[in-house]
Amino acid sequence: METTVDTTITWVIKNFSSLQSAPIYSDIFVVGGCKWRIMAYPKGINKAHDSFSLFLNVPDNESLPTGWRRHAKVSFSLVNQGSEKLSQRKVTQHWFVQKAFTWGFPVMITHTELNAKMGFLVNGELKVVAKIEVLEVVGKLDVSKESSPIMKTIDVNGFQVLPSQVDSVKRLFEKNLDIVSKFRLKNPYLKTACMNLLLSLTETLCQSPQELSNDGLSDAGVALAYLIETGLKLDWLEKKLDELKEKKKKEESCLVRLREMDEQLQPFKKRCLDIEDQISKEKEELLAAREPLSLYDDIDNNV
């Protein structure tokens, strides 16, 4: 387990307007001894949103040691090359694990905003700046190990998922039989993206309130709302999120009360320390008072 520093990555997406719905990826880079890449959906993972989706992704996650985890904070900025003040910035943080290795923003910016605000697209290029801060790493990747060019996927109820995700996806369908009864997306890339986001969301909501920040819960709410709009039936997950928000409120309330009680207790603690000090002094005086007198001390001194 280790704490690492942050790194800033700039990714220039060329010929943006000609890109289709398939996901695109930045070059792989290393932060904190871990491989990362930025993943984007030029048309969004839900066409109804008409948006640009942006995520941080762990590549070659199948090659990572069992039990690996990494906690990262990412800040994505879409650079407005005409005016820096108009640049769009969003921040999130997430525990990346074997079954939830992608996290970010289904709606980083809408196409309407991209086209309306002059300066984002210059000569057909969109500039993305990502600041990645790896907060904690459990189980390091050997970055010298070559990545496998082919990643095997398995079909589970019409979704192409990685072997490490199969059990989690099967459990989702077993416990929620109608989860995709009204799911609208047909594009296989977009379906995979939605499933990855859903798995990341379920992993997030399984964390303790202590591990989750209010910003993290807010991000989870945005991701959940987005997934619901694709037609996924996630009533049970909404309930889970509400319960987690309530537990977070209780946790914060308890912390406030504990701090208040501790502040109230401080004067008494100081008083107790003062009394203990007085008791020690009194005991010393008591021992001195109980010392027997020697009748010969004065005689010896006079001789």
Swiss-Prot record:
Residues 6-132 form the MATH domain. PROSITE patterns: MATH. Residues 227-291 form a coiled coil. SMART domains: MATH (SM00061). Disulfide bonds: none annotated. Gene3D superfamilies: Apoptosis, Tumor Necrosis Factor Receptor Associated Protein 2, Chain A. Keywords: Coiled coil. It comes from the Eukaryota. The keyword Coiled coil applies. PANTHER family: TRAF-LIKE SUPERFAMILY PROTEIN, UBIQUITIN-SPECIFIC PROTEASE FAMILY C19-RELATED PROTEIN. This is MATH domain and coiled-coil domain-containing protein At2g05410. It comes from Arabidopsis thaliana (Mouse-ear cress).
